[in-house]
Each structure stands twice: as C-alpha cells, then as structure tokens.
C-alpha cells in the first residue's frame, strides 16, 4: 500500500471515529454502555395475569404500574383492551366491554348511541390507528370505578386524519365480576 493511501485511510478512520463518538452525545460514556435484560417477575407489562404487552396499538404512559392495586390494574387493563379493540375495529370485544345504553359524545359535541358509534367504526368512518393512555388516574369504590386520562388518538375521524389529544373520564361498573364501561 502506498504511503498516500495509508494517510487517506488513517484520516478517514479518524473522521469516522469522531462521528461515532459525537453521535452518542456529549454526556454519553460509550465504554460503559450495557444492555439491561427485562426482569422475569410480576412487574412491568405482565403483572398478576394482566399482560399489557398484547395491546400493540395502545401506549400507556405517566403511571407507575407497580403502585397500582389489583382493582386499579384491572380497570387500566380493561381500558387498554377497549382501546385495542377500537384500533382493531373489533366490535364484538367492544360490545362485551360497553353497556348497551352507552351514549358517546365526540369532541365536536355530536352524540351517538353505542350501536351508531360501533357502526361508524365498523364501516371505517371512524378509524383508530393508535391510542395513547397518558397520565391515567384510577379511582375504585367497590363496584364502581373511573379512569381519567388524556387520550392521544391517531385517527381518521370522518375524513379528518390527525393526532388528537383529549382529556376525559370513563366510568365502569362491575357486573357479574367484570368491569363494564357505562354512562356516568
């Protein structure tokens, strides 16, 4: 190899090294980077039979899952299951989770019965892609519960595609051992 080629190769390697180091950021120590393995305990996504990782289109943020009681966790799980069913347009699952007399109020103020709302999801008038459950606050009082959170909806609502952030509350009642979404 010629001396000129060696200098060019050395210069190129130095430039690449500088790019790699600076790409890691000012405060990153690349010599101590480790990979942390997820714990195999009942913490994180899978706790006491509640496997939140199965909800591919639902992201839950702003809550310490380890601090939840079993009842609070079950409410959050049902809410996530409902949101996943919305993104899958799984009307059968939604029917299982929602009372028959449910009335939906859209951010526009438009109100719909359960079946009208489900019909719009089924025919694609309402299409949910992902749903975030941000900063949920869960309150349980025996057979009644509510969850207040900010929805982060990536959706196409009647031809208007976008990401919509809305704060709201869902109310639940326990019926035959199952939590059902109800009107207030």
What is each model feature region?
Residues 20-23:
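C-terminal motif of bacterial Sec signal peptides marking the signal peptidase cleavage site
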Residues 25-92, 96:
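Short, low-complexity N-terminal intrinsically disordered segments enriched in polar/charged residues
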Residues 95-132:
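Short solvent-exposed beta->alpha transition segments
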Residues 143-183:
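Exposed beta-sheet edge and beta->alpha loop/turn motif
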Residues 82, 94, 102, 117, ...:
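Hydrophobic pocket/interface hotspot
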Residues 13-18:
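Hydrophobic helical h-region of N-terminal Sec-dependent signal peptides
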Residues 118-160:
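Surface-exposed, charged secondary-structure patches
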Residues 2-11:
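Bacterial N-terminal signal peptides that target proteins for export
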